[in-house]
């Protein structure tokens, strides 16, 4: 969408974590970003001021709770409170990246379930709906007692790889860990390609001892994961694929954090191209072979469909050309 959206009762606001994607979402939706200010005092306290009326409006607040996670989360909570006190009709949050979603279960004795805690805090603050992108664990949706729309990036990736000609039996989609099989299978189905899995000890020091379940010899491999953090998982997986006879290795992830020297790790790995979405704005150095694929159109369309009470199901698939549309 390029024209101004007709219904002025809907308003978008961007907080400070990822202004670039917010601007793209606003442009795609045809809704200008609302006027507000956010500043941090010398002691770390956050002050927000909404500089226009929101009374009776449906508000969508765009904020990735990425690094610095706690500052961005608190900024979001304070903005929610400000909208509630200003008599907004509904307050909806758009989280391109949902921090703390990896802490979704008790993996060891006496561990918290922080994703549930964050869900409780956001709900208590007064939100009506969550729109997010590729949750690390889909069960996090169940931590909320309000609607949660978890948009998928796999259709975006499938369209990209199809246009590059990376599909069919000479391509294999690889999950770098056994917990990502469902994601790999989803992309593989779009590309009409087989899948493979790398299984290895979870200890970082033993990653290079991983082994492949499936056939990658003589094939172009696409590694897929949801979060690219330090880059070690992709880097070691790419080395294993190279040793196992893969001709080229590509990598794709929904969220590119690039933390802890990830650029240095990935630049020495045999990976031809890394694709991530723009869900996270990072200050860390990014490898030169990274391509950003914007999720802004997808999120903008979801916002408009929600506001117009239309189904989101058309956003959850990609129909490659030449396939039967029946």
UniProtKB/Swiss-Prot annotation:
One of its GO terms (cellular component) is ribose phosphate diphosphokinase complex. Keywords: ATP-binding, Cytoplasm, Kinase, Magnesium, Metal-binding, Nucleotide biosynthesis, Nucleotide-binding, Transferase. Coiled coil: none annotated. Its EC number is 2.7.6.1. Its cofactor is Mg(2+). It is found in: Cytoplasm. Belongs to the ribose-phosphate pyrophosphokinase family. Class I subfamily. Homohexamer. Involved in the biosynthesis of the central metabolite phospho-alpha-D-ribosyl-1-pyrophosphate (PRPP) via the transfer of pyrophosphoryl group from ATP to 1-hydroxyl of ribose-5-phosphate (Rib-5-P). This is Putative ribose-phosphate pyrophosphokinase 2. It comes from Streptococcus pyogenes serotype M3 (strain ATCC BAA-595 / MGAS315). The gene is prs2.
């Amino acid at each position: 969408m390029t024209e101004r959206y007709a219904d002025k009762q809907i308003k978008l606001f961007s907080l400070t974590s990822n202004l670039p994607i917010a601007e793209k979402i606003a442009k795609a939706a045809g809704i200008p970003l609302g006027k507000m200010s956010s500043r941090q005092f010398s002691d770390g306290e956050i002050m927000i001021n909404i500089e226009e009326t929101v009374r009776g409006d449906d508000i969508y607040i765009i904020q990735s709770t990425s690094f610095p996670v706690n500052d961005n989360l608190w900024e979001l909570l304070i903005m929610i409170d400000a909208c509630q006190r200003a008599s907004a009709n509904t307050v909806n949050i758009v989280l391109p990246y949902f921090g703390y979603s990896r802490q979704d279960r008790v993996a060891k004795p006496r561990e918290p379930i922080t994703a549930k805690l964050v869900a409780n805090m956001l709900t208590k603050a007064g939100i009506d709906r969550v729109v997010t992108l590729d949750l690390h664990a889909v069960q996090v949706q169940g931590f909320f007692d309000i609607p949660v729309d978890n948009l998928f990036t796999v259709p975006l990736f499938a369209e990209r790889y199809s246009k590059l000609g990376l599909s069919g039996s000479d391509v294999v989609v690889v999950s770098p860990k056994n917990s990502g099989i469902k994601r790999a299978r989803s992309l593989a189905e779009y590309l009409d390609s087989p899948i493979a899995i790398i299984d290895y000890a979870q200890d970082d020091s033993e990653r290079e001892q991983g082994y492949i379940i499936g056939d990658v010899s003589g094939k172009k491999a696409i590694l897929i994961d949801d979060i690219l953090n330090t880059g070690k998982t992709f880097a070691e997986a790419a080395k294993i694929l190279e040793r196992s006879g893969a001709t080229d290795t590509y990598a794709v992830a929904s969220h590119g954090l690039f933390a802890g020297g990830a650029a240095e790790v990935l630049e020495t790995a045999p990976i031809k191209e890394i694709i991530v979405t723009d869900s996270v704005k990072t200050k860390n150095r990014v490898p030169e072979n990274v391509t950003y694929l914007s999720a802004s159109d997808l999120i903008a369309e979801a916002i408009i469909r929600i506001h117009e009470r239309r189904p989101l199901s058309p956003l959850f698939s990609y129909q490659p050309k030449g396939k039967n549309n029946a």
